[in-house]
Regions:
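Short beta-strand/loop motif that positions the catalytic acidic residue
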Residues: 211-213
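Active-site glycine-rich loops that stabilize anionic/oxyanionic intermediates
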Residues: 7-10, 81, 215-216
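Alpha/beta-hydrolase fold nucleophile elbow
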Residues: 69-81
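Alpha/beta-hydrolase active-site loop
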Residues: 49-68
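Conserved alpha/beta-hydrolase
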Residues: 14, 19-43
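Alpha/beta-hydrolase-fold enzymes
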Residues: 87-174
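Short beta-strand element of the alpha/beta-hydrolase
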Residues: 1-7
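Catalytic active-site module of serine/aspartate enzymes centered on a nucleophile-bearing elbow/loop
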Residues: 235, 239-276
Length: 276
């Protein structure tokens, strides 16, 4: 079984096509919407207090539900983008409950940048309110990703080379949007947690890890994904697979070569878990 953790500004329903392909190979998929995502009153906001801890607690609650219903089924945790950071935080806290880890469109962010962003978000939360939206924070967090694809057809060209997929994202009322000061404070705080000294060493060393993404993904790309893989390898994890896709952008499961990417993920899981 795969437990999917979606990215920032999207929702679990976007993984239906991936789930259908997995189901055809007898692999079940479970996904939930993170706080502040999907059909919620407070879109773009985790919580007024302890947002990151609550997000991780939600993942654990879903995992416990899976364990209660399917106690003998191994679970692979797949996190995309923001979900990959949540996934890492989860396995650092609850490593024994995971049979494999897949990190899609992730990165190993520079801590200096993270500290600056975290401080800015904390200050804005204190001065103007945690639920308020600040255009500077949102532009700093997401607005620059499209710059390398100029002249761009849309402001979301960085997501995929497939124009139909980009348009589908734009037309989805549950995608995009702006995010609160407190969410940015929580998210950058979570990133500081998972990139802290020896954090990767707290992940169970025998955990199989697949790190995948597009070489042109502005979030991590070749450099960020390679650095992330190196961090885990240097902390004693000897079952780390790095898969980079030439010309690929941020959402490899929605890219022009998505069928091949999906097949790679399924085959990796079957190899690690067994096809039965």
């Amino acid at each position: 079984m795969i437990q999917v953790l979606h990215g920032l500004g999207e929702h679990a329903g976007r993984y239906e096509r991936f789930a259908t392909a997995c189901n055809a190979e007898r692999i079940a998929v479970v996904a939930h919407n993170h706080r502040g995502h999907g059909h919620v009153e407070e879109f773009g906001h985790y919580a007024d207090h302890d947002g990151w801890a609550n997000v991780i607690a939600d993942v654990l609650q879903v995992r416990q539900h899976i364990a209660d219903r399917f106690p003998k089924v191994p679970v692979v945790l797949l996190g995309h983008s923001m979900g990959s950071y949540i996934a890492q935080s989860f396995v650092m806290r609850h490593g024994g409950n995971n049979h494999a880890l897949i990190l899609s469109a992730s990165t190993y962010a520079p801590r200096g940048q993270l500290r600056a962003g975290h401080l800015c978000a904390q200050l804005l939360t204190a001065l103007t309110g945690g639920q308020r939206v600040n255009s500077f924070l949102n532009h700093s967090g997401l607005g620059k990703f499209n710059e390398r694809f100029k002249p761009a057809r849309t402001k979301f060209d960085w997501l995929s080379r497939d124009e139909a997929e980009v348009d589908r994202y734009i037309q989805d009322p549950l995608c995009g949007g702006d995010f609160s000061n407190k969410l940015w404070a929580d998210l950058t705080g979570g990133l500081l947690e998972i990139t802290s000294r020896d954090a990767a060493a707290t992940v169970r060393q025998d955990l199989p890890i697949l790190i995948l993404g597009g070489e042109r993904d502005p979030v991590g790309g070749t450099i960020g994904l390679t650095l992330l893989a190196d961090v885990y390898r240097k902390t004693g994890h000897d079952d780390v697979t790095l898969k980079l896709y030439p010309e690929g952008r941020h959402e490899m499961l929605n890219e022009t070569n998505r069928d091949a990417v999906t097949r790679d993920v399924i085959e990796w899981i079957q190899n690690k878990m067994g096809s039965a």
